[in-house]
From Swiss-Prot:
HAMAP family: Phosphoglyc_kinase. Pathway: Carbohydrate degradation; glycolysis; pyruvate from D-glyceraldehyde 3-phosphate: step 2/5. Substrate binds at D24, F25, N26, R40, H63, F64, G65, R66, R122, R155. One of its GO terms (cellular component) is cytosol. This is Phosphoglycerate kinase. The gene is pgk. It is an enzyme of class 2 (transferase). Belongs to the phosphoglycerate kinase family. One of its GO terms (molecular function) is phosphoglycerate kinase activity. The keyword Nucleotide-binding applies. It holds the Pfam family PGK. It comes from Synechococcus sp. (strain CC9311).
Amino acid sequence: MAKRSLAKLNTSDLSGKRVLVRVDFNVPLNDAGAITDDTRIRAALPTINDLIGKGAKVILAAHFGRPKGQVNDKMRLTPVATRLSELLSKPVTKTESCIGPDAEAKVNAMANGDVVLLENVRFFAEEEKNDADFAKQLAGLADVYVNDAFGAAHRAHASTEGVTKFLKPSVAGFLMEKELQYLQGAVDEPKRPLAAIVGGSKVSSKIGVLEALIDKCDKVLIGGGMIFTFYKARGLAVGKSLVEEDKLELAKELEAKAKAKGVELLLPTDVLLADNFAPDANSQVADVTAIPDGWMGLDIGPDAIKVFQAALADCKTVIWNGPMGVFEFDKFAAGTNAIATTLAELSGKGCCTIIGGGDSVAAVEKAGLAEKMSHISTGGGASLELLEGKVLPGVAALDDAA
């Protein structure tokens, strides 16, 4: 069901209104406490600027890290407030706590177009418990609710789900709307052929998404460490490559399911091997039927890259989740980089390319190709759950579109 969005609320709906906006500001910091990547902050700017332009009083709620329901000075949102202020070119007032007298006083002092950032909502254990009283206190600061934190939409927490019971309208922000449009659109009404590229080290973390994608896709390409579980299930030797012994039957079932449905399931034909798990390891290319003892696969091979590129050439929609190899080591990044380059080229030819969160996003950014993709998802777990066809509590709680 489509959700009501911020785009449908105009100045007369929002001017002078206190708007609680759930954002995803869970950014990485270095040891000195400085932000190393502000992508998530920048991703929320369209929603924040729209609300400022419509004369709203913008109250931002966010979590940061895992403080386990206690105040942790290392997880305060102070550096985020500073960076956001720079990006908006206007002051951002941060509260000492997300609820209570200080938050109330700072919200009451707001003029239209002002921005207040509430302190880390996870300093209260009630946030993750979706406690109704806590949600009511948060909601009490505002008149309207906007959820723009897609990365937290798969959690039923007080600031993502609970507050919607007390605030109407409750709508999707621009980032949330874009995520739903691309990810749901790719699954529900894709332009075909539809291909999914699924990588990463473990089958276990991608079982749900693999099963769902085999149901929906024309082609499924598998890379990353999980391929060795499939090879071992076929009876092939895999050296000392990563294998999930308890998932061998599942790998067989997934291959059989794809075959029964007429879905092209592609595994690499060759792999790049290493003699140990290190950036400077000795390496060699081997056919997957001839992996020697004592070696481990850390990337897909050159022949596999060509086969994958050929399979993707005619696709109109491609979803990518998970790297092809250990791309953090330059020596074993060729497969991942080749997929990133191929998708960038396909985008230029009108293919809808969706990078589904997590390490694939880091890989695309490392390759300098982020701008070339149709959509880069900001959600890791949320992206996977949406692609699996699961209902995201933070989305379900929003008002339905009229």
